[in-house]
Amino acid sequence: IVPTEVTRTPSAFFALLCAEGVTVLNQTPSAFQALMSAQEEREEAAGNIERANVIAHRLRYVIFGGEALEPRTLASWYARHGERTQLVNMYGITETTVHVTYCALRAEDAMRLGASPIGVRIPDLQLYVLDARREPVPMGVTGELYVGGAGVARGYLNRPELTRERFIDDPFVAGGRLYKTGDLARWRTDGRLEYLGRNDFQVKIRGFRIELGEIEAQLAKVTGVREVVVLARDSASEVHDSATEHATPNALSPSPETSTATAAATATATAPEKRLVAYYTGDADVAALRAQAAQHLPSYMVPSAYVRLDAWPLTPNGKL
């Protein structure tokens, strides 16, 4: 059993993996990013890659779960190690007995921006990508993901209304049941699924309905950006007039300062107006982020603030 303090200290955890010869690791993508950084620091301390390889890990499989994977964050891993360790991305939810799909990743996946590849179904499950009328959507078209099969739970304990809303009759299989995930997905031409985020992550700002993932995908293209998250924050929070360029990991909680390039909307008397805030890790310049957003996104999708973090704030179990 790994001591709690070790699990929360990436350098100590990586040292343990090497010392014990661990071959299979299951982590959240955020925790794995911290582990990658610890490995890079260890290699630098060793002096060169050849010496570092003597104390390298023996991982054969790394399995991701618990949160959405941004494939581009694995580019440095593939650059250092190639494909000798099989990386696997899994998608799942509690209501379907956790695991639903798996995707054996390749180095080329790290070159893709935006969507997270979640692969193909576990054999005893059925997957459907449906539109608002619960009709199958064509390949490449975004829809909501529904899951059927042996893993679907009976429902929520003592919550009959929510059970009726989320667990529905399967219109394609007599006597079957489906779970309405609330997740957006689309089929790729190679038969694999892509995860596109939550349908409730669409926010409405100044009358426009916005998909936050589209903004993140554009900002991720900027050189020097390692990871990026865009949130809709209440304008009623404290606002200043200068650009925020750096913050500590706990900055996701307090309100950041705004950019002078895009003014925050004024809160209404009945409900606070939302504004977009981009948080990122890496060494990208805020001006480059603003320019990318202004060039490729409509004005209502341009974040009003940009906050650089040294590292993502993680929960005790490694989630963002």
Residue map of PLM features:
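Adenylate-forming
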Residues: 1-117, 124-126, 131-136, 161-162, ...
